[in-house]
Amino acid sequence: TSFGAGNDPLWIVDGIAVDNIGFLNQSDIESMEILKDGASASIYGVSAARGVILVTTKKGKQGKISLSYNGFYGVGNAAKKLDLLNASQYAMLANEKRINGGGNAYFPNPDALGAGTDWQKLIFNSAARTSHDISVSGGNDKSTFFGSFGYYNQEGIVMRDISNYKRITARLNSSHKVFPFLTVGQTLNYTHVKSQGINSNGEFGGPLSSAINLDPTTPIIETDPAKIKSSAYNNPYILRAPGGNPYGISSLVNQEMSNPLAFQQTQLGNYNWSDDFVGNVYAELKL
């Protein structure tokens, strides 16, 4: 056991110690080197106890100005969904349980319910992933430069309206030979991240747990006037769909399992964002 050190390695990006490299555009990375020997601890201290990873970003080179672009587009989907009961099957099983317990059948006509609500189909969606990177570099025997701009956008496969990640990066690295014995330069990086995630275990559950546990006999939106007048919907703060009808509430499942569509409405606009500037200015003197 070590004190003063975490489980993560120490990241050194262009000579700067950082907690992680989430702010970096992968296209800007020139090389990565892992240091595992004891010498790293003598250089970087106790924070290097778990190892050191040196990251060097791209620099400009002498020659003509070079312009490059790299991009891709892809779509992701859930690899597999659980094979759950439909509404008719669920109703038959619920009736059997009640009858075996000495009660009356809860559903008078299970076959009439059909497939019912597929909660997994409601929350899972195709998720697009887009990346665009453009860079320019060049220089002469006196100065070199490398500049880049990156855009990355990824939707979540679960309710993409409230699960997504967007990152914009900009970088400028340059080096200037002021005198034959003196070179100065800088590495500057700006990153803007805007993201939205889904709580998997909140006070009222989450879309994933609800999609698995909610019964298929409950509709996404309740349209039955008789049920809307019941005590379950007798709440002025209950969430309603754009048409005015309330989102379906299950009378069979623990109420901590919220309607995923109602949950989605409470999370719209709930974003996290950050703006990070990382850089350094250096001078190299040859004696």
Regions found by a protein language model. Give the residues of each.
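Short beta-strands and strand-coil junctions in structured, solvent-facing domains, enriched
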Residues: 2-4, 18-20, 38-43, 60-63, ...
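Membrane-embedded beta-strand positions in outer-membrane beta-barrel channels/transporters
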Residues: 14, 52-54, 68, 131-133, ...
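N-terminal periplasmic accessory domains that precede
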Residues: 1, 14, 48-71, 134
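Outer-membrane beta-barrel transmembrane strands
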Residues: 124-143, 150, 167, 261-287
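Short, glycine-/polar-rich solvent-exposed loops and beta-turns at beta-strand/coil boundaries
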Residues: 24-27, 44-49, 125, 162-164, ...
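Surface-exposed loop/interface segments of Gram-negative outer-membrane beta-barrel transport/assembly proteins
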Residues: 61-116, 157-163, 171-278
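Short acidic/polar hinge/loop motifs at secondary-structure boundaries
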Residues: 9, 14-42
